[in-house]
């Protein structure tokens, strides 16, 4: 009897069915998202999107404001959602999370909400899978971090007055990339900083302690 039980445990742990459960983890987190994260979508909307994506269909639904929201990417650990024409949402389950663990308390993920009006600016947050927010461990770069030392002072001050920074999560690893947005500058100012800005890449690490 013990051998049968051990065999069952082994088969469950390493079977394709178990791997499928692991792959579904990020979709389950998304399905349970609170209204503050996806205010335009009902839970049924999100479940429909997941079903469409998993059946290789366009995952677009009509949202509460009669606009359209589309789940663009859904993989084992990452998803990307176009919530509206002006809002893009990314979610990434961190690799130090244990997908096979029966306890969601050990799992952590990062979410990036990017709002464009029209230039994009992002908000970065960390959660456990019960949607308890975690302390912020990702440092939002300052404008000066993106600029070379010889950037014109007037351009530097203009960027500091309205610091618009876009963040993007990597689908392939636990990194986040920050890009300084310069579209609010004049054409002449943008010419002055050509080749004088850089992207900033950070590793995403979440603490277990809740806020």
Placement of each model-derived feature along the sequence:
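Short, flexible beta-strand-to-coil junctions
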Residues: 83-86, 112-119, 179-185
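Terminal domain-start segments
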Residues: 22-100
